[in-house]
Amino acid sequence: MTRTSSPPCRGGVPAQPAGWCALAIVVMLAGCAVGPDYNRPDAEVAPAYKEAGEWKLAQPRDDLDRGKWWQVFGDPRLNALVEQVEISNQNVLAAEARFRRARALVAGSRAAFFPTLDADVSVTRSRSPAGAIGGTTAGRVITNRSASLSSGWEADLWGRLRRAVESSEASAQAGAADLAAARLSAQGELASNYFQLRALDAQKQLLEDNVAAFRRSLDLTKNRYDAGVAAKVDVVQAETQLKSTLAQAIDTGVQRAQLEHAIAILVGTPPASFSIAPATLASAMPQIPPALPSELLERRPDIAAAERRVAAANAEIGVAKAAYFPSFTLAATGGFRSAEASQWFTAPSRFWSIGPALAQSIFDAGLRRAQTEQAIADYDATVAGYRQAVLAGFQEVEDNLAARTASS
């Protein structure tokens, strides 16, 4: 029911008992929210790591600051390269843009809680047919002037808006975890490539020293052969040894160039304009403390992102189910309307309207049911993805623990 008025108001509208009752009902219903409340899905977790030794299980702590972990290696060149990843790595920049988009979606979903306010000003000229029946404007050209403000607000009776905010917030948290995962992945890949490159530097230097030694040995063997104190087979053997070592040195150089190119891409630089001078490692590799808990798994941002996507999908079920219930809105409009410019913004030209509206879809050919089933299927898929991420995380921890145990 909408109440309207064209003449000027001369007093307040008396409160009606029915109106207060309706307002109380709206307030009470605003505390409801359809759809399932979120609970983190169970994931199969072993009571202990197979390769754990002194390691232990721990709780997720992906929100902890990892700090500049690469600085423990004490390599200034590595430090500079990793710092550049944050600025120039394209995968990190893309993840950061997606996170900003997710935060904007949160702001957009929260805006639905508040009323809207729109302004409209128009001046139109119109002419009615000369033969029109009734009215005094037949055949005349009329100029209508209007200036108004309109406002609308939707009462979140069934929690549709709240579930939408829950979904967008969880998606933004997943975006933050994705950004952390992109940073960690790029930093880890760069560090791994860098240490492989430095290992190849040492290997290449050793091979070059061997090539020089084998070349001297070949010259000596040839001289001995010319003097008749060495057999031809000794010369052939020395030549084969030199050629084999030369081939290894060339292959090592190719591998080093490929790693250098990979590092260039990670820091967002064209390979043609990027190079790393050969050098030895700045320090020995740090040792992992034997009593360190399994933080490798508990702080993984990819698992946190998968879990947050489950929460977002769960909230979308509530959004879909809220469509089964009617929507309740309040709308109000007021302003000035006149055919005479001199009377436009005067009291007799004022108008207003205010009232609630209730809307309910009666028939949609199964659309709402299909949307609900889609939301449930999306939730089931994210649960499976979360559990798979947990399993993959445990596999990687077990693999690294096994490698650490074998090398100790």
Features from the language model and the residues they span:
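Glycine-biased, low-complexity coil/linker segments
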Residues: R10-G11
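Sec/SRP-type N-terminal targeting helices
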Residues: L93-A94, R110-A111, A155-R183, V233, ...
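Membrane-embedded beta-strand positions in outer-membrane beta-barrel channels/transporters
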Residues: V82, S146-S150, Y194, E239, ...
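Terminal intrinsically disordered/low-complexity segments used for targeting and assembly
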Residues: T2, L23, M28-I87, R145, ...
